[in-house]
Amino acid sequence: MDQQDHGQSGAMNYGTNPYQTNPMSTTAATVAGGAAQPGQLAFHQIHQQQQQQQLAQQLQAFWENQFKEIEKTTDFKNHSLPLARIKKIMKADEDVRMISAEAPVVFARACEMFILELTLRSWNHTEENKRRTLQKNDIAAAVTRTDIFDFLVDIVPREDLRDEVLGSIPRGTVPEAAAAGYPYGYLPAGTAPIGNPGMVMGNPGGAYPPNPYMGQPMWQQQAPDQPDQEN
């Protein structure tokens, strides 16, 4: 029975999500699932699957259009992003000596596609929450839900990451006391994580040294010396 469920889960993830899900958001869903009611959890999972399928279709259509536009491009002088600024950023690397004229053009197109994809993923989170204005927490959601965007975790405000992870948990599934201390990755500075920290701001939990286990001292009770009794 376990093998069958495992196979179905793997097929669903492969077919609905083009990228691997970030462990941070996966942990939140797992913890929520443990305390959720069966009916509420099933509805939440179905809704998430529909959102993932819709996003996968949008991403596929997006990249198909991008490839077609690249093949049809003939004007390499006009760009959405300033080439001078891109070239200045490239020169910030001390190891870079010379930059060809074509390199900033390629970077400009790559940055444009990166912004478009991140916006598409962020807008999906906006519609998921039935809003019409894209907010910074939507960008945080796109970052935490996409494995290839892990390098952006450090520049996204922690409050937005925390709200995104807690917002993915169905209401009434986690007690208030547990929600206040979850997830481990967003504890204030100087606070030691409780239990297994998992992922902490995109870094493995090993960034915090585990507290060593201190066993209880075993004291041997020595019997008081008794004077020898003369027979």
Curated annotation (Swiss-Prot):
Signal sequence, renumbered to the chain: none
Region (Disordered): 211-231
Record keyword Metal-binding present: no
GO biological process terms on file: abscisic acid-activated signaling pathway; gibberellic acid mediated signaling pathway; positive regulation of photomorphogenesis; regulation of seed germination
GO cellular component terms listed in the entry, alphabetical order: cytoplasm; extracellular region; nucleus
Domain of life from the UniProt record: Eukaryota
Main location: nucleus
GO molecular function, a single term: DNA-binding transcription factor activity
Keywords: Activator, DNA-binding, Nucleus, Transcription, Transcription regulation
Localization in the cell: Nucleus
Tissue expr: Ubiquitous. Present in etiolated seedlings.
Quaternary structure, from the entry: Heterotrimeric transcription factor composed of three components, NF-YA, NF-YB and NF-YC. Interacts with NFYA2, NFYB2, CO and RGA. Interacts with REF6 (via N-terminus).
General function of this protein: Stimulates the transcription of various genes by recognizing and binding to a CCAAT motif in promoters. Interacts with REF6 to directly regulate SOC1 transcription in response to flowering signals from photoperiod and gibberellic acid pathways.
Family of this protein: Belongs to the NFYC/HAP5 subunit family.
Name listed for the protein in its UniProt record: Nuclear transcription factor Y subunit C-9
Organism annotation: Arabidopsis thaliana
Source taxonomy: Eukaryota, Viridiplantae, Streptophyta, Embryophyta, Tracheophyta
Gene name, Swiss-Prot/TrEMBL: NFYC9
